[in-house]
Curated annotation (Swiss-Prot):
Catalyzes the formation of S-adenosylmethionine from methionine and ATP. The reaction comprises two steps that are both catalyzed by the same enzyme: formation of S-adenosylmethionine (AdoMet) and triphosphate, and subsequent hydrolysis of the triphosphate. This is S-adenosylmethionine synthase 1. The gene is SAMS1. Induction: During compatible and incompatible interactions with Blumeria graminis f. sp. tritici, especially in the infected epidermis. Induced by abiotic stresses such as wounding, cold, drought, and salt. It catalyses: L-methionine + ATP + H2O = S-adenosyl-L-methionine + phosphate + diphosphate. It is an enzyme of class 2 (transferase). It is found in: Cytoplasm. Binds 2 divalent ions per subunit. The metal ions interact primarily with the substrate. Can utilize magnesium, manganese or cobalt (in vitro). Belongs to the AdoMet synthase family. InterPro entries: ADOMET_SYNTHASE_CS, S-AdoMet_synt_C, S-AdoMet_synt_central, S-AdoMet_synt_N, S-AdoMet_synthetase, S-AdoMet_synthetase_sfam. L-methionine binds at residues 58, 101, 248, 279.
């Protein structure tokens, strides 16, 4: 009898989706602040609807930042250059409502900049998760990797002119058939591929389907995962001309599963974009990913999740938890001990060890196509840390 398999699905949206537009604007503001002032305290939200983008939040920085220019440049770089495609970067309304960080939070977290890095408290309470699995070279879930890469490829063939009919907004979804091998996930095949992409008025549905198969799906999904039973839903609604902020309102922090593990593992609920590294929603999730990835890369387990939790103003995490889903070479309590001995979970030290105070175009890169499983020197949390432990006991 064949081993029992199951289906699991992950989705993604590309950079022209209104929620992702907002994530990118928020992280572009963060980048601009950190580039001039590494100690900037940033909590920047963005919302958008037809012909309007608003940035708002709390920012304390010595940087001189032209918020309107950042908004327009970000929208233009995505491809929002006319009302036809969903937004005109040069003509839309830009609203700005930025205040300083609350002094109550400032004194509790960093003592108005008087605390040493190791004494800096968490910027808020919260729970964060890191996840890793040996099913792909990225040590990420295959369903999430494929959905994300399809979205990135859609943008690539739009911007390089391969598919000139494409417009910025688009969504992807991939269903993978898996085998559970003692707690480890083994992908068997791709069951379903769904792509809904914004397009211009000139193209037919048949042309859309043919181009998506040839120029998007074929280069992204390895042939070994596709067979005659694989189902393709390519623009199943039949028409997607109106998109971007014209089609839907957008808001920072609305795509947190796409940003992380595509529904695998767990999520503490806190979004990443627009937050400086004292916000443990972001830095805590990054160090938890590095810990989980390092556990898998070191051979201690085939799949694992790490949870950490914080209290506002307190440097040390309240709890650290590890679960290897039964795939651990040693008991989970031993893996937990190794994690605690090898990783410093204090927010001020995470910032230093992962070099999270560097801006430029560092964080805007994270704001589309996932924060994890990416090969880029700026994604310092993706660097596997060699774990020091007694090899004999493992």
């Amino acid at each position: 009898m064949a081993a029992e398999t199951f289906l699991f699905t992950s989705e993604s949206v590309n950079e022209g989706h209104p929620d992702k537009l907002c994530d990118q604007v928020s992280d572009a503001v963060l980048d601009a602040c950190l580039a001039q002032d590494a100690d900037s305290k940033v909590a920047c939200e963005t919302c958008t609807k037809t012909n309007m983008v608003m940035v708002f939040g709390e920012i304390t920085t010595k940087a001189t930042v032209d918020y309107e220019k950042i908004v327009r440049d970000t929208c233009r770089n995505i491809g929002f250059i006319s009302d036809d495609v969903g937004l005109d970067a040069d003509r839309c309304k830009v609203l700005v409502n930025i205040e300083q960080q609350s002094p109550d939070i400032a004194q509790g977290v960093h003592g108005h900049f008087t605390k040493r890095p190791e004494d800096i408290g968490a910027g808020d309470q919260g729970i964060m998760f890191g996840y890793a699995t040996d099913e792909t070279p990225e040590l990420m879930p295959l369903s999430h990797v494929l959905a994300t890469k399809l979205g990135a490829r859609l943008t690539e063939v739009r911007k390089n002119g391969t598919c000139a009919w494409l417009r910025p907004d688009g969504k992807t979804q991939v269903t993978v058939e898996y085998l559970n091998e003692g707690g480890a996930m083994v992908p068997v095949r791709v069951h379903t591929v769904l792509i809904s992409t914004q397009h211009d008025e000139t193209v037919t549905n048949d042309e859309i389907a043919a181009d998506l198969k040839e120029h998007v799906i074929k280069p992204v999904i390895p042939e070994k995962y596709l067979d005659e039973k694989t189902i393709f839903h390519l623009n199943p609604s039949g028409r997607f001309v109106i998109g971007g902020p014209h089609g839907d309102a957008g808001l920072t922090g609305r795509k947190i599963i796409i940003d992380t593990y595509g529904g695998w593992g767990a999520h503490g609920g806190g979004a990443f974009s627009g937050k400086d590294p004292t916000k443990v929603d972001r830095s805590g999730a990054y160090i938890a990913r590095q810990a989980a990835k390092s556990i898998i890369a070191s051979g201690l387990a085939r799949r694992c999740i790490v949870q950490i939790s914080y209290a506002i103003g307190v440097p040390e995490p309240l709890s650290v938890f590890v679960d290897s889903y039964g795939t651990g070479k040693i008991p989970d309590k031993e893996i937990l001990k190794i994690v605690k001995e090898n990783f410093d979970f204090r927010p001020g030290m995470i910032s230093i060890n992962l070099d999270l105070k560097k801006g430029g175009n560092r964080f805007i890169k994270t704001a589309a196509y996932g924060h994890f499983g990416r090969e880029d020197a700026d994604f310092t949390w993706e660097v596997v840390k060699p774990l020091k432990f007694d090899k004999a006991s493992a």
